[in-house]
From Swiss-Prot:
PANTHER family: HTH-TYPE TRANSCRIPTIONAL REGULATOR, HTH-TYPE TRANSCRIPTIONAL REGULATOR SUTR. Induction: RamB represses its own expression (independently of the available carbon source) and is negatively regulated by PrpR. Residues 21-40 bind DNA. This is HTH-type transcriptional regulator RamB. GO terms for molecular function: DNA binding; DNA-binding transcription factor activity. Residues 10-64 form the HTH cro/C1-type domain. Was identified as a high-confidence drug target. SMART domains: HTH_XRE. Belongs to the short-chain fatty acyl-CoA assimilation regulator (ScfR) family. Involved in the control of the glyoxylate cycle. RamB negatively controls the expression of icl expression during growth on acetate as the sole carbon source. Does not regulate the expression of other genes involved in acetate metabolism. It comes from the Bacteria. CDD domains: HTH_XRE. It comes from Mycobacterium tuberculosis (strain ATCC 25618 / H37Rv). Keywords: DNA-binding, Repressor, Transcription, Transcription regulation.
């Protein structure tokens, strides 16, 4: 760390807190000129200064590690591979730009995303000219905006998390179970009437009517699911102003995005209420992040536990930084949140060599995989299917695969690492995976479905190869 140049990150923290260089220099007990040199990468960040910065700002030292840029580097690299732009940029130049100017790199990625969406909408509008379609829509997909909101905050929302934790502690002073205390809070404090219904229909799990102050919950939900729905509605009633402020801070571009963000924040609050941070963090560490054991201990679903684990990034009490995904049999990724720099392609598709997809052939079984991304970084992935059974005959159920991954350097904290070689030795068998065929740079992958963007193909009509799209070697 003695030769680490992270001026842009120090400048980012200072600007976010509204400190002047002189004020921050005084807090760090260094001269303003020294701080100015650090911010402009003239001088490196020493261990002593790093420790003082982490104390002043309450951030983990890993905030200054280059690994935190992984996703942004991959996203910017994906932009440069766009054939429409017709540019050729060396990957090292991309990494240098992200390191020196992360804000500018993020702006380029966001502009390209809007360009791509606008192009798609223009094509759709052209097709709709002879139909009743208007071709209108938000410049950004609502779910993408909300997903990026959580990612930019490392999937941890301190104000909402601590509010839920404090409320849970207050309610449990009565020494009752959480379901009873949530019911008491809703009925006695907010005057809500709670009805358990069996006739809400196949598509409705719960419904709250503000006009009548009535909360209807499907009897088909498990006790844990019913508690979660009550906690989510309590979020609006107790902390509606906080949620509104957080949505405003997110600067969402459409009403749909704002509504989806409010829903996501309410669900975050519910998870933080059912699984309060400090206790859950301590139990998770004690159980070595055994998801099934935690699920049994808290009487909530495997998916709920896995998702909550991906939010344990409180600066003073960090858990393992996880990436959480949920996919279906067709490869659709319906949920993805990350406290790490793990990159998902925006060009479509993921990787068939990833163990998340193998779980559908082994329903209910935990599968563990050491996987290596094209940049050489190794991850430990834990995957299992979850099934939401139908409430009646003839109604289709739902089956998903849940993936939980972390960088290999954190894997020793997980029970799933037992018996695995965590040395990262190049000779150790790690499955080579990628973010998706269109952006994956592995030249000879036998599972490649599409050629990589921006790469010239080495085609020969008189030759057959394992990989259908060999790349020309320069």
């Amino acid at each position: 760390m003695s030769k680490t140049y992270v001026g842009s990150r120090v400048r980012q923290l200072r600007n976010e807190r509204g400190f002047s260089q002189a004020a921050l220099a005084q807090m760090l007990e260094i001269s303003p000129s020294y701080l100015n040199q650090i911010e402009h990468d003239v001088r490196p960040l020493t261990v002593a200064v790093l420790l003082r910065i982490t104390e002043v700002f309450g951030v983990d030292a890993t905030f200054f590690a280059s690994q935190d840029d992984t996703r942004l580097v991959a996203e910017l690299r994906e932009v440069t591979l766009d054939r429409d732009l017709d540019i050729a940029i060396d990957p090292h130049e991309v990494a240098e730009m992200v390191s020196a100017h992360p804000g500018l790199a993020c702006a380029v990625v966001n502009l390209h995303r809007r360009y791509r969406i606008t192009t798609a909408q223009l094509a759709a509008a052209t097709e709709e000219r002879f139909s009743d379609g208007s071709g209108r829509g938000s410049i950004t997909m609502p779910h993408e905006e909300v997903r990026d909101y959580f990612y930019q905050r490392q999937n941890y929302l301190h104000a909402l998390d601590t509010a839920a934790e404090d409320l849970t502690a207050q309610m449990r002073m009565h020494h009752g179970d959480l379901a009873r205390e949530l019911t008491r809070r809703l009925t006695e404090v907010h005057g809500v009437r709670i009805n358990k219904r069996i006739d809400l229909g196949d598509t409705v799990l719960h419904r709250y009517d503000p006009a009548t102050n009535t909360l209807e919950i499907s009897s088909h939900l498990s006790p844990g699911q019913q508690v979660f729905k009550m906690a989510a509605e309590l979020a609006y009633l107790e902390f509606g102003d906080l949620i509104d402020a957080m949505v405003t801070d997110g600067k969402f571009t459409s009403a749909e995005s704002r509504t989806l963000a409010r829903l996501g924040l309410a669900n975050y609050f519910a998870a933080a209420t059912v699984l309060p941070y400090r206790q859950f963090h301590d139990v998770a560490e004690n159980f070595r992040y055994d998801v099934e054991r935690l699920s049994a201990f808290y009487s909530v679903s495997y998916e709920t536990i896995a998702h909550r684990l991906s939010t344990l990034q409180r600066p003073s009490m960090r858990g393992v930084p996880f990436t959480f995904v949920r996919v279906d049999r067709a490869g659709n990724m319906s949920k993805r949140q990350s406290a790490t720099g793990f990159h998902f392609s925006s060009s479509g598709g993921t990787c068939p060599l990833w163990n998340v997809y193998e779980t559908f052939a082994n329903p209910g079984k935990i599968l563990v995989q050491i996987a290596q991304m094209p940049d050489g970084r190794n991850y430990l992935w834990v995957a299992r299917t979850v099934e939401l059974r139908a409430a009646r005959y003839g109604q289709p159920g739902k089956t998903f695969a849940i993936g939980l991954g972390c960088e290999l350097r954190h894997a020793h904290r997980l029970v799933y690492s037992e018996g695995l070689d965590l040395s990262g030795d190049p000779n150790t068998a790690a499955t080579p995976i990628g973010a998706g065929c269109r952006v994956c740079e592995r030249d000879n992958c036998p599972q490649r479905a599409f050629p990589a963007l921006g790469r010239a193909l080495d085609l020969d009509e008189h030759r057959s190869t394992v990989s259908p799209y060999l790349v020309k070697q320069l």
